[in-house]
């Protein structure tokens, strides 16, 4: 048996030769599947532009369904759908322009913010009457004893890991 060609758009395979591949790639099922795939990645502005240029589909308006589906030459969107889509396009446009508005804000220095924070914390009365206790590390329930755990799952020593002098990595 010869090599087989698998089409990702159609999710099917066939014998790979020039005639079969050309016939498949120009076939209606393949073209529909390919269009459907690329339509998933279209932005709202392109969809809105296409839908505004189409006339409403009479069959879809009367029966609620159309035999042509997404390949119909006419629009299946109602006026309300078009308005919602235009609002979405406007929000996306504003979101793209937002970084331009951020550039106009005054530049704040980290040191200034830290100084203000330190002043605020020192002038505010302490709301805690008791000292802060260190949290005690506990292993999850159902884990094996600590001696059986690999080093990566064991708790760090109380003072932290000791630094190894002149250790080279890699």
From Swiss-Prot:
GO cellular component, one term: U12-type spliceosomal complex
Zinc finger (C3H1-type): 51-79
Region Disordered, annotated ranges: 150-170
Compartments (UniProt record): Nucleus
SMART domains associated with the record: ZnF_C3H1
Keywords tagged on the record: Metal-binding, mRNA processing, mRNA splicing, Nucleus, Spliceosome, Zinc, Zinc-finger
MF term (GO), any: zinc ion binding
GO biological process assignments: mRNA processing; RNA splicing
Main localization of the protein described in the UniProt heading: nucleus
InterPro entries: U1-CZ_Znf_C2H2 (IPR013085), Znf_C2H2_sf (IPR036236), Znf_CCCH (IPR000571), Znf_CCCH_sf (IPR036855)
UniProt subunit comment: Component of the U11/U12 snRNPs that are part of the U12-type spliceosome.
Protein name as annotated: Zinc finger matrin-type protein 5
Organism: Bos taurus (Bovine)
